Amino acid sequence: MNQNNKHRTLLFRAALAAIAIAAAIFFWYQLKTPQQSSPSDQSSGLRHSPLPPVQVATAKEQAVPRFLAGLGTIQAANTATVTSRVEGQLIALHFQEGQQIKQGDLLAEIDPRPFQVQLAQAKGQLAKDEAILANARQDLNRYQKLANTHLISQQEMDNQRALVRQHEASLKVDQAAIDSAKLQLTYSRITAPISGKVGLKQIDVGNFISSGNSSSIVVITQTDPVDVLFSLPENDINAVLQAQKTNHDVVVSAWDRNNQQQLAAGKLLSIDNQIDATTGTIKLKARFSNQESILFPNQFVNVRIKVDTLENAVVIPNAALQMGNEGNFVWMLGKENKVSKHLVTVKLQDTKRVVISAGLAAGDKVVTDGIDRLTDGAKVDIVTPMVNKPQPQKHDQTENS
């Protein structure tokens, strides 16, 4: 029994010794084997650094155009409401709704027969009065012969001369009636007063149409070119006037409602002669070519008018500009990758870039991302933004959408 206990004790001690030796070998192997980074770290390329990571951009010197912005409305350069100048039955329409027409094109016809009858009557009256005048002149010639023999009085002679002049005047009245009848007959053929695009017809063939503005046939709008009417604050008028003096053709561009896509470019046409006392703005008009018919009357657009160009301007991304209690500032990257706060003066700013007039020079580096963790004099870790290539399937979906 004692021998069995001793044997078990020896086996237990031998097992413990083997475990201890195996553990020692394992830890020794771990210490000698270098650690490898995880696959995710290798694929992403991220660097684990105790320094705050930032992205930077370099201030650039470039020419920057200066624009004034406003909200405008497209207007047709000319609009004409086509009406009839004579009364009658409409017998024909010679246009299609939405058609582009030219000045002088035939649009509609009114029954011409009543006007042809009036013309014939006027011509008949002229022929009648011509015959009466011829007879009066013959009588006058006879009276003149008899006057030499004193067979008629001077009073009768004067009356005959007056009668001839009266009939001569009647011929002029008759000729005027003929001209009027011809004009009325011409008005029965209604032509386009301007070139442009016709709208929807306002009357159908077969209806009786009256003269004047009471019954219109169609409205024509001149859509090429078109005008844009917009307003600017009265404080901007001096910049516009100066731009007109420097460059007579002031460039104006029209943008879509989201202010993302330029629709057309044109030139400033005119400036109103007074400021609206209620709004403190002044109206301006620009003219645009519209050959592709992408601008429609009464369409709202964003307007940008170029007033000048800032040469050698210092430009930084809009993300670099910060606002503090002391004013506008940027985080500038200095030596040893240390950042410092610099106050700057802003000249111009839009959604993408900022023009700095003081506080920065071309070539200075400013922080654009990671700004919230910065302190003055802190050392930073500059990282490059990762650009993910779009997958083909997503790209196709974007194009289809």
Curated annotation (Swiss-Prot):
GO terms for molecular function: efflux transmembrane transporter activity. Gene3D superfamilies: 2.40.30.170, 2.40.420.20, 2.40.50.100, Helix hairpin bin. Residues 1-20 form the signal peptide. SUPFAM superfamilies: HlyD-like secretion proteins. Disulfide bonds: none annotated. GO terms for biological process: response to toxic substance. Transmembrane segments: none annotated. It holds the Pfam family HlyD_D23. Part of a tripartite efflux system composed of MdtA, MdtB and MdtC. This is Multidrug resistance protein MdtA. It comes from Photorhabdus laumondii subsp. laumondii (strain DSM 15139 / CIP 105565 / TT01). The lineage of its organism: Bacteria, Pseudomonadati, Pseudomonadota, Gammaproteobacteria, Enterobacterales. The gene is mdtA.
